[in-house]
C-alpha cells in the first residue's frame, strides 16, 4: 500500500520507519532544510536522533508529492501536533483526499474542538477519516518494540484499511467506531499525566500515584460520555492504556511538566527545557471549560488547571484535593 505520513516529528518519523518495512512510505515535513538534512543523513537528527531510516523510506518537503504518492486508494496519516492540524487541513483542501487518519491528540485552543471536528469543518464529512491512538512512545516504536493502538472511525472500510496497513509483527491494531471516546481519552490523559508528575515530584508515593490514575480515569470517562463517547472505550487502549503509559513513563513530556512544577519551576522555564509546550498544557484550559459547560465533576483536571493558570502552588492544590469529602466510588 502507498502511505504518506504528513509530519516529520518523532512520532511521524517512527511510524514511517516501522511501516516502510512493508509498504511504500513517504514522510513529508514542511521544513525543506530539515528534510534535506534528514535525506542526506538518513536520520531525523532533529526529532528522532540515533535511528537510521530504512533504505526504502522516501522523504519530501513537497505536500503535493506526498498526496500524489498516496494516490486514490492509499493512506494519508497526519502526524502533526494538534496545533498544526488546522493549517495542514487548509492546505489539503484543494486536493482529492483518499483516506485520512490523524495521530494528534487534544482539544484545540480557543475553539475547544476535537481533531475530527476540525477535519470535518474544513474538509467535510464525506472523506473516510479517523484517529489512530493508544499507548505509544516514538522511541520504542522506532526500536521495533511491540505496542498496540486503536483505529477509530465511522467508516468500516477505513478501519479495515488501517488494520491492513499498520497491523504487523510489532504493532497490533484494534478497531472501534467510537471516534469521540478515543479522542477524548487521548486528550485528557495528558492533563492527568501532569498531575501524576506533580504527585511524583512531591514524593507522595506509589499509593497516591495509583489512586490519582484510577480517579483520573473516572474523570476521563465522565467527560467522554457527556461529549458522546461510550464508557467502555475508556477501559481500552485509547483510555486506560494511554493513561497508564503517559502517567508512568519516563519519556512522557506531560509527566515532566508535572515534575518540574513540583520542583518549583515556572511553566515558562519548563517549556524552554522541553523545547515545546506539552499537549496537556494546551488542553487543560479547554477541558476545564468543557467540564463546566457540561456539568461534569473533574477535580483533578481543575486542580492541574489551577496550578498552570491560576497561580496555585502544587502542594496547596494537592492538600485541597485530599480535603474533599468522601463520595461513592462509582458515580
Curated annotation (Swiss-Prot):
Active site (catalytic residues): 189 (proton acceptor)
Domain of life: Bacteria
Binding annotation for NADPH: 11, 30, 105, 138, 253, 277, 279
EC number: 1.1.1.94
Compartments (UniProt record): Cytoplasm
Amino acids binding sn-glycerol 3-phosphate: 105, 134, 136, 189, 242, 252-254
Keywords per UniProt: Cytoplasm, Lipid biosynthesis, Lipid metabolism, NAD, NADP, Nucleotide-binding, Oxidoreductase, Phospholipid biosynthesis, Phospholipid metabolism
Gene Ontology MF: a single term: glycerol-3-phosphate dehydrogenase [NAD(P)+] activity
Annotated signal sequence range: none
Function summary: Catalyzes the reduction of the glycolytic intermediate dihydroxyacetone phosphate (DHAP) to sn-glycerol 3-phosphate (G3P), the key precursor for phospholipid synthesis.
Name of the protein in its database record: Glycerol-3-phosphate dehydrogenase [NAD(P)+]
Species assigned in the record: Janthinobacterium sp. (strain Marseille)
Amino acid at each position: 500500500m502507498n502511505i504518506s505520513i504528513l509530519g516529520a516529528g518523532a512520532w511521524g518519523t517512527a511510524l514511517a520507519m516501522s511501516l516502510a518495512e512493508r509498504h511504500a512510505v513517504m514522510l513529508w515535513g514542511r521544513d525543506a532544510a530539515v528534510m534535506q538534512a534528514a535525506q542526506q543523513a538518513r536520520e531525523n537528527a532533529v526529532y528522532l536522533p540515533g535511528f537510521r531510516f530504512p533504505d526504502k523510506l522516501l522523504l519530501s518537503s513537497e505536500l503535493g508529492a506526498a498526496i500524489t504518492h498516496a494516490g486514490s486508494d492509499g493512506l494519508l496519516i497526519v502526524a502533526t501536533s494538534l496545533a498544526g492540524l488546522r493549517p495542514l487541513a487548509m492546505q489539503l483542501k484543494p486536493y482529492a483526499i483518499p483516506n485520512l487518519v490523524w495521530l494528534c491528540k487534544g482539544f484545540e485552543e480557543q475553539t475547544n474542538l476535537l481533531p475530527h471536528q476540525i477535519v470535518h469543518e474544513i474538509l467535510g464529512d464525506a472523506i473516510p477519516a479517523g484517529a489512530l491512538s493508544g499507548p505509544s512512545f516514538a522511541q520504542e516504536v522506532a526500536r521495533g518494540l511491540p505496542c498496540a493502538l486503536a483505529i477509530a472511525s465511522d467508516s468500516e472500510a477505513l478501519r479495515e484499511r488501517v488494520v491492513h496497513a499498520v497491523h504487523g509483527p510489532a504493532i497490533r491494531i484494534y478497531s472501534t467506531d467510537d471516534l469521540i471516546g478515543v479522542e477524548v481519552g487521548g486528550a485528557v490523559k495528558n492533563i492527568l499525566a501532569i498531575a501524576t508528575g506533580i504527585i511524583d515530584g512531591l514524593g507522595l508515593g506509589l499509593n497516591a500515584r495509583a489512586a490519582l490514575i484510577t480517579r483520573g480515569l473516572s474523570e476521563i470517562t465522565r467527560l467522554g460520555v457527556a461529549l458522546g463517547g461510550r464508557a467502555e472505550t475508556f477501559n481500552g487502549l485509547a483510555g486506560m492504556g494511554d493513561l497508564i503509559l503517559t502517567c508512568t513513563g519516563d519519556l512522557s513530556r506531560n509527566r515532566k511538566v508535572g515534575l518540574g512544577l513540583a520542583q518549583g519551576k515556572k511553566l515558562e522555564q519548563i517549556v524552554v527545557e522541553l523545547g515545546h509546550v506539552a499537549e496537556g498544557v494546551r488542553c487543560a484550559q479547554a477541558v476545564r471549560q468543557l467540564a463546566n459547560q457540561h456539568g461534569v465533576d473533574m477535580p483533578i483536571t481543575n486542580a492541574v488547571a489551577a496550578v498552570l493558570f491560576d497561580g496555585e502552588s502544587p502542594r496547596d492544590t494537592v492538600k485541597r484535593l485530599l480535603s474533599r469529602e468522601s463520595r461513592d466510588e462509582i458515580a
